[in-house]
Design a protein with these regions (language model features):
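C-terminal leucine-rich, beta-strand-based interaction scaffolds used for sensing/assembly
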Residues: 2-207
Length: 207
């Protein structure tokens, strides 16, 4: 297959020593399972390949997903998608206010419900001092958490007998459940594609 020729590696699992049997898992990991996300990843990888003046006989490796040249460009794209979505319902000031919250996570891309509440409390203190009209999405901690989940900015994590379950809104949404609810009192993680733009996490610890 042409895919296996250009991406001849197994995608590493983030939390175990095992690997997935296809590099395509890396693409899904960074995407929201939308075709345009996959095409954007391919476009950035191709652009970087050319900019690095690599030989035409070379192929891609898993390290290409960890290079700043990729993570910055792709993270900027994903954040732009969030901004475009919000622009239909909220002002640019609301968008900037949303981004302000992530400063209170102190660089952490993974956090507990208790840590989320602590960050939200500090976020509210900032709003009370600096914002005249508070947006509806940050009225309460749970409303704000649901808002982040609806935007696919965060997922909830639940431990199972096999391995952790990651609940994403885009996966949980179905014809019979068009407005899935985020799990409260769980653990949470910011989407991989947004970490760089939000200045969260150092890198992914592939084992």
């Amino acid at each position: 297959m042409a895919w296996d020729y250009y991406f001849p590696y197994n995608a590493p699992r983030v939390r175990s020593e095992q690997t997935h049997k296809s590099a395509f898992i890396n693409f899904l990991r960074f995407s929201l399972y939308r075709p345009r996300d996959i095409l954007t990843i391919l476009s950035i990888q191709k652009e970087n390949f050319i900019e690095q003046r690599r030989r035409s006989t070379e192929v891609f490796s898993k390290m290409d997903f960890q290079l700043p040249a990729f993570t910055w460009k792709y993270s900027d794209y994903v954040l732009g998608e969030v901004k475009d979505h919000l622009s239909f319902y909220y002002s640019s000031e609301d968008y900037e206010l949303l981004l302000k919250f992530f400063e209170y996570l102190n660089g952490h891309s993974r956090f507990t419900y208790e840590e989320f509440l602590a960050a939200f409390e500090n976020y509210q203190k900032f709003i009370e001092k600096n914002v005249k009209h508070k947006s509806s999405f940050c009225e309460t901690p749970d409303i704000f958490l649901q808002f982040l989940y609806d935007l696919n900015v965060v997922c909830y994590i639940v431990d199972t007998d096999a391995e952790p379950f990651f609940g994403w809104c885009y996966r949980d949404r179905t014809q019979s459940n068009i407005a899935p609810k985020v799990r409260a009192h769980a653990r949470y993680e910011v989407h991989y594609g947004l970490m760089k733009a939000l200045d969260l996490g150092k890198h992914f610890d592939y084992k």
